[in-house]
């Protein structure tokens, strides 16, 4: 029997490959960073070839380091940064421009115009998304309009569009597909019919010929070229990073929720087969589709997206230079007893849910002569938790439920100070699992189910284990005062860059 699943985890700042055994444990992991490109204020790009080369390199390297071959791998599962938009030549397989990253805000004015034209309700009803430059649709339109010759070539059927999952699968196998979870992040996909939407494509002037075929999240969608790993490996699982993390956290039942603390911060609440429309500026999105085709059972999610979480810590390191390593932030923050009145609004690229203000900008308020770098570090960590509170309050209003616990993962979930503060501000227990690499684990589980490496979701759920539980311990008065101060500071940051 083949012993491992290879998870490909393509993130915003690095590409990783992780091997999982049948117990859902990590057998080997390799990571490689690659550069982000910032050609103008508010613009963020990637070289799609740099993504491909780094991802292939770590996949090959992890097999080599563990003295394994393709014969030991039952399947590949792919998870990816979502919304990031790639446009490439079908014949050569080469990108015709840099990829536009999910953080990129260049199409904010286009979204403003579409809202002014009264199109926001149509987009929300069909896609479950707010009309924001965060999503792929307006990014793709921008590429077609601003890349010389792109629109003519697209009309001739020479070009292919995809999010990062599509791009990697094309490079691995030659197939042009995407799963329902990634498609649901494009502003072009009807989450109810589970098909590309002709009306929305026409509104954004996007040719249907560009689009990948829609496939389930769990199922064999292609075989890797034999030249890549010595023999072919089935590609059997696909999900956007946050949906994959939700699956990896075994949040398989309605009412279960997880929060991932990565570059951004993303809370997803499973609503089962019901797509709940948000009235509080959250997103309704597809979690996963399990079955032989896209008409199979689909689980929906409510999602709150926070743009800046781990990226704040990177800025403290690279922008301010007040820490040498990201892991140093907890020690610096705990060197002072509190934030000293400092509040940090990390709206470097606007504010996400529930504000959706692309014109908000990063703000630090409440500083005095007594403020120092430790207060700023502590306020930066606290801002991650505060943004999560804003999302949860909106989520509970939409779903009409009170959360019983929050499962957490991602790099910053290893920060005990942040997790305790998160429990205090949410006023619910925060639970950290033994395996915090749940994004890659979710992709592995989806692939493993497709090839019978695991038999069922129930078997997967038994593998989930708690590492630590953080109980809330803040007084009601302090809780209320802190939230009041946070919301005052948010108002200072909003609508700044108009």
Swiss-Prot record:
Domain of life of the organism encoding this protein: Bacteria
Entry keywords, A to Z: ATP-binding, Glycerol metabolism, Kinase, Nucleotide-binding, Transferase
Catalytic activity from the UniProt record: glycerol + ATP = sn-glycerol 3-phosphate + ADP + H(+)
Enzyme Commission designation: 2.7.1.30
Activity regulation annotation text: Inhibited by fructose 1,6-bisphosphate (FBP).
Pfam families, alphabetized: FGGY_C, FGGY_N
InterPro entries hit by this protein: ATPase_NBD, Carb_kinase_FGGY, Carb_kinase_FGGY_CS, FGGY_C, FGGY_N, Glycerol_kin
Keyword check for Hydrolase: no
GO CC terms of this entry: cytosol
Example GO BP: glycerol catabolic process
CDD domains recorded: FGGY_EcGK_like (cd07786)
Binding annotation for sn-glycerol 3-phosphate: 12, 82-83, 134, 241
Coiled coil, from the record: none
Residues bound to ADP: 12, 16, 263, 310, 411, 415
Residues the entry annotates as binding glycerol: 82-83, 134, 241-242
Family: Belongs to the FGGY kinase family.
Stated role: Key enzyme in the regulation of glycerol uptake and metabolism. Catalyzes the phosphorylation of glycerol to yield sn-glycerol 3-phosphate.
Protein name as it appears in the record: Glycerol kinase
Species this chain originates from: Herminiimonas arsenicoxydans
